[in-house]
From Swiss-Prot:
It is an enzyme of class 3 (hydrolase). The lineage of its organism: Bacteria, Bacillati, Cyanobacteriota, Cyanophyceae, Nostocales. It is a multi-pass membrane protein. Belongs to the peptidase M48B family. PANTHER family: PROTEASE HTPX, PROTEASE HTPX HOMOLOG. The chain crosses the membrane at residues 8-28, 29-49, 151-171, 183-203. HAMAP family: Pept_M48_protease_HtpX. This is Protease HtpX homolog. GO terms for molecular function: metalloendopeptidase activity; zinc ion binding. InterPro entries: HtpX_protease (IPR050083), Pept_M48_protease_HtpX (IPR022919), Peptidase_M48 (IPR001915). Its cofactor is Zn(2+). The gene is htpX. GO terms for cellular component: plasma membrane. The keyword Transferase does not apply.
Amino acid sequence: MGNQFKTLALLAALSGLLIAISYWVIGGSSGLIIGIGLAAVTNLLSWYQSDKIALAVYRAQPVSESQAPRLYRMVQRLSQRANIPMPGVYIVPGQTANAFATGRDPEHAAVAVTEGILNILPEDELEAVIAHELTHIINRDTLTQAVAATVAGAISFLAQMVSYSLWFGGIGGRDNERGGNPLGVLLTVVLAPIAATIIQLAISRTREFSADAGSARLTGNPRALARALQRLEAAARQIPLNANPAFEPLLIINSISGQFLGNLFSSHPSTEARVQALLKLEKQLPTIA
């Protein structure tokens, strides 16, 4: 229920923000009508298509057992162990090392890994990463994360459109009730990206700790995930995954780490904190497994 409530709250926040932006930028009743229409379309899109959007953003390609036997069989084996339907299996092209899961429920889920992660992680560490992503699916985190990413992406996109329009004759008609509000335009361009970041931060960082713990329980090997996280953080510094920042929270690890502002506004806890939590969990595992 907590995830469902948070998802609904995010959708409501998006609706209110889009309507407010339309009102201040376009003006009057026209702005309200356009805002309501945009809110309705975006809500439906984020609810039903957010997984497809996430996969498209990262250019993830579906793979079969014959195309990626090692990965496919690993996802299949862990899904059976977790007693969930097997999600779709995807590979993201490129040598950056990362992974994510998406989908509104276990029946409509997907797990995606990069080519880079397949190249650098040994068997036990890759298994721990897959188990982490499956735990997100089990906990229904994937719905909340995907919707939040779509919401934040929509806000950022709208801010960019408003910014571009300033270079091409302005926005808002002269025949509406308010004629467009210059202050509203400025606030949209400046504050909308910040609002997108706040929405990302609304997704609790404890979700990552929970997924880490779920991986440890599923594999019985918390130290493998700890090693994988350290390896992935080092790899991300060398080859970051370039994509819309709104979809950063879907990844198992921040694609760009070690920067003050990046850590301050990160939707992930620090890798050091996650590793320490896993090492503590290792001592407790026989009693909680």
